[in-house]
From Swiss-Prot:
UniProt keyword list: Cell inner membrane, Cell membrane, Membrane, Transmembrane, Transmembrane helix
Lineage of origin: Bacteria, Pseudomonadati, Pseudomonadota, Betaproteobacteria, Rhodocyclales
Predominant cellular place of this UniProt entry's protein: membrane
Pfam families documented for this protein: Virul_fac_BrkB (PF03631)
Membrane-traversing stretches: 29-49, 92-112, 132-152, 174-194, 207-227, 239-259
Subcellular location: Cell inner membrane
CC annotations in GO: plasma membrane
Similarity-based family: Belongs to the UPF0761 family.
Domain of life: Bacteria
Membrane topology: Multi-pass membrane protein
Protein name as catalogued: UPF0761 membrane protein AZOSEA40600
Record's keyword annotation contains Cell membrane: yes
Length: 407
């Protein structure tokens, strides 16, 4: 019963995150963006391989891998063939045209970056210059790394088949598994490196492997659907290539985003036993707990890692990131270059009332919501008075402050 309950809880968390971040709608947007950016992406990749003849075999291996494993039969391969032809003709573009192509490719990568950060609940992405540099390296070095991996595994498969024999089931099974493993590795790298959020390698691998398996199954089912139910071909004729390819892109992005949501959900799922049960004012309690820990660290002249703050406040990693992000917006905390956290002002300058006002009960918001109602206005004033009377500086709540009061 317990494993079934845990599985049900995990599916609830996964479905909640997948829908809350609007992944089905975002997948549609990414499908159209990919359709627009596919030629610019291929242009940059082909230019990279053509300018370095030593990498020509890598380029050919990458092209074969894309056609055989990432695209549906017929429609995808027709689109890819035209895209490769257009990309090769792009060599005659002017400087402005080339810049526009590169910018279009970078825009797709930046859109993916934004979507992944949203799934992980990241409030602040990397600085723009850092993102551009990361995306440029991904655009230039990524195809080389993927092409090298495909070429190396191709040699490995050929060697395995030669050792096991031409008709051996071992070689055939290995040849079928390798593309799935490569896809899983590619997705895992995406889930690990793209979000501006600490992601455990094990969680990224789990999401990547799950997405790769679902992707391969979806590819087979999609191929069977197109062959057995040729509705698009009957209605659109030759033009059926485009809607079929768009549907394929949409389903592909749904699978990729589902894998990302799975990777982002795993920490919350494993932390659920340590997370404090929800109660009125729980966010204010967690924020005060974090601030007191940071005030103690400030007194000791140290900083604290996120894991320590999260464990002390007994919140999920996503909620902890959100709380710290809001406190950073308020000017109370700051993020160090090493990845730790510290108070950005003296503990005596942060009041308990300000924290409660931001995370639990805001008299100002109550007053604004009253819409001129006299009773609501009077209640808001009394709440503000009560908060002011109960206010304490954060320094009075720290270990050092408690010792002073006790003494």
């Amino acid at each position: 019963m317990m494993p079934l309950t845990a599985a049900r809880e995990f599916m609830r968390l996964l479905t909640g995150r997948f829908l809350a971040t609007r992944c089905p709608q975002v997948a549609g947007s990414l499908a159209f963006t990919t359709l627009l950016a596919i030629v610019p992406l291929l242009t940059v990749i082909i230019a990279l391989f053509s300018n370095f003849p030593a990498f020509s075999r890598l380029g050919e291996s990458l092209r074969t891998f894309l056609l055989e494993n990432l695209l549906p039969d017929r429609a995808g391969q027709i689109i890819a063939t035209y895209a490769f032809q257009f990309s090769q003709q792009a060599a005659g573009l002017t400087l402005i045209g080339t810049v526009l192509l590169v910018l279009t490719a970078l825009m797709l990568l930046m859109t993916i970056d934004h979507v992944f950060n949203h799934i992980w609940g990241v409030r602040r992405p990397r600085p723009l210059l850092t993102r551009l540099m990361v995306h440029w390296f991904a655009l230039t070095l990524g195809p080389l790394a993927l092409g090298g991996s495909v070429l190396a595994t191709g040699h490995l498969v050929a060697t395995s088949i030669a050792l096991a024999g031409e008709g051996s089931w071992v070689g055939a099974t290995f040849a079928r598994l390798v593309p799935t493993v490569l896809l899983g590795s590619l997705f895992s790298v995406l889930y690990y490196a793209v979000p501006n959020h600490p992601v455990r390698m094990l969680h990224a691998l789990a999401g990547g492997i799950a997405a790769a398996i679902v992707f391969v199954l979806m590819q087979r089912l999609f191929g069977l659907f197109i062959v057995r139910i040729p509705t698009y071909t009957l209605i659109y004729g030759t033009f059926a290539v485009l809607p079929i390819f768009l549907v394929w892109l949409y389903l592909s992005w749904v699978v990729i985003l589902l894998g990302a949501a799975l990777s982002a959900t795993l920490p919350s799922f494993f932390e659920r036993a340590r997370i404090l049960r929800a109660f009125p004012g729980d966010r204010a309690w967690a924020a005060v707990t974090m601030l007191i820990a940071l005030a103690d660290a400030q007194h000791a002249g140290t900083t604290l890692p996120f894991a320590t703050l999260q464990a002390g406040a007994r919140v999920s990693s996503n909620e902890g990131e959100a709380l710290l992000g809001e406190m950073r917006d308020a000017g109370w905390v700051a993020h160090t270059e090493e990845g730790n956290w510290l108070l950005s002002r003296q503990a005596a300058q942060i009041g308990l009332a300000a924290v409660v006002n931001r995370f639990a009960l805001s008299p100002a918001a109550w007053r604004e919501a009253s819409d001129g109602d006299e009773a609501s206005r009077r209640i808001a004033e009394r709440l503000a008075t009560a908060l002011h009377s109960a206010d304490l500086p954060l320094s009075a709540l720290t270990s050092a402050g408690n010792r002073v009061q006790t003494g």
